[in-house]
Amino acid sequence: MKSNAVTSVELELDWTAQTILPIEFRGRELQLEARAYQGADPNFQALVLVHREKHGAHEKPVVRVHSGCVTGDIFHSLRCDCYPQLQAAMNTITTSPLGILIYLPFQEGRGIGLVNKIRAYALQDQGYDTVDANVAIGAPIEARDYDLAAHILFDLGYPEIKLLTNNPAKVEALREEGVEVLEQLPLIVSPSHYNKRYLATKKERMAHKL
């Protein structure tokens, strides 16, 4: 399958394939470049979607590094803000001259995995906040790293980015990997009855810019 942007082909190195992915987003039909990457650990995989306009070749890309969330991204759980953040990020990415989504499905629950996330949710039902719940089940508060995301950005040829995130730790982690974050662009979403305490905890205890 061919397009003006890229040809579908099996690739060498540590990324496995690329193609054109047609999607429907908010009433628009878009054709995005899609690449699948494989990290050193076979469980560490990433899907990269690139939106580029003809005049965007020399722009600094707007980038979202998004941790996978089965409950939020797929089932639209109201307990977190993952789905509305992903939607807001995709809107910005697909209306920018050059935008990139790096989707990391292995980072479920800030890296603690799906089962531990549900265990932590059960404790939150008993009154724990998201930080204390992780501690109570013996899981890290934050278990993610961004070396694969940084590798992807360098592989794509974009060591300088504008990052869509509320999380200053993500900014610093990418900088430690050598990525120059020129600007942090917040993703502000409206809290719901179900996630307002979660968002307050992220702001007060994890320094998120909300």
Segments predicted by a language model, with ranges:
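Catalytic domains of riboflavin
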Residues: 1-210
